[in-house]
């Protein structure tokens, strides 16, 4: 299977299946000598792991990270960094009765069309279990970015038709992490929980919107045309199985505005930086960060695995009643939050390392230019020396002739 690697300068590859013995991630392009807080890495995995509340799947996976290469004495070595996570609570027997059924909303049919085979146990490679590895890689990326003053904050903006109030300028991480749906609005959080419980009781699921805000991203980060920062964010977030849409800044709301309203004028701040009045663009213009907060939102579909019966076809073409007996999330938004943060962090770190290479290349070019200038001066001096020596030889020869 191809396309298992993400990134350009900071790359990672994930492997493993939901019901296999292990899942893992290998990171390449990690600089040597960087400190990694293993406890913080585990904390990020704990935010995503199953069984953490009444609105998540009861599957009991500790998701303990095992760093098996590229790490020694608390620091990276510069070699590929590999992290393994053991699967400990698989119940493959739950999937036996549905092995030949084309599961609605799942990748079974499309994988069969592409590969001719599909691991039906928990969705195999297409399972959301793979996102634990993205969180592991993203946790490391977050630590590196924090050293540059970059902070990434994700939260559940809405569940079904319940929308959190985000009108205040400051979104509190403490408030977000204090409720099981990870909403920035405690009142809306309670309503979201009620909606999720109601859907679960009915054997159903609900979707929502997850928002990610990046603070401290330096202006100028990003590339034009085919490697735009916002394009890379959209690509990264759309690689998550449950995501059906991405918007940045005003996003789709901009389609209902006139240009005179959606355009965002600049002003010069007291510190001399140019800022935008409203940040309608969500921190990115022309594919390059403008120094404002980067604001991203993703549409999270209702989880496809539900216990409510659905009519669908099996591989023989017969219509059958389908329902899932396994353990599944009635709403995945709370667990998507750390995953979305991770993917945003990985895109940012990829661009930061690319920018560093460009800066290093530019510095190298400047040094080479200075060396070339010095070489030119040396060449001119050598020519002058030859002329001088030639003139001395001519004068000496003339003196000898005059003596004769």
Language model region names:
Residues 1-59:
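N-terminal, positively charged regions that mediate nucleic acid binding
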Residues 44-104, 108:
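Glycine-rich, N-terminal phosphate-binding loop and its surrounding beta-alpha-beta segment
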Residues 99-125, 310-330:
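Short acidic, glycine/tyrosine-flanked loop/strand segments centered on an H-E-D-like triad
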Residues 18-21, 135, 203-319:
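Glycine-rich anion/phosphate-binding loop at the beta-strand->alpha-helix junction
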Residues 21-33, 128-150, 227, 231-235, ...:
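Alpha-helical support elements that line or immediately flank enzyme active sites
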